[in-house]
């Protein structure tokens, strides 16, 4: 398994991609936004497209960091 940060796609850049033998996890991180906004960005910018032909399970993970609380305030994990 390995991880890449700022992984380029055709129309954007995923914050992090984790490659496992049977799955790919695409992370989008927001700062004072929402996890739902992060998931939307993964969908709208097609961050999963480069991995769709590999036959692996695909996961999108949206995470929001709240600067006031100084912690992760929200996250969503969805299998595509």
What are these regions (language model features)?
Residues 1, 47-51:
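Conserved helix-loop functional segments at active or binding sites
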Residues 31-48:
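Mg2+/Mn2+-dependent nuclease catalytic core
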């Amino acid at each position: 398994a390995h991880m890449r940060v700022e992984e380029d796609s055709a129309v954007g850049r995923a914050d992090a991609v984790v490659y496992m033998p049977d799955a790919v996890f695409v992370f989008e991180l927001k700062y004072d936004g929402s996890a739902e906004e992060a998931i939307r960005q993964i969908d709208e910018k097609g961050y999963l497209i480069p991995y769709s032909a590999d036959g692996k399970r695909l996961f999108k993970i949206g995470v929001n960091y709240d600067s006031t609380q100084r912690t992760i305030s929200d996250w969503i994990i969805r299998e595509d």
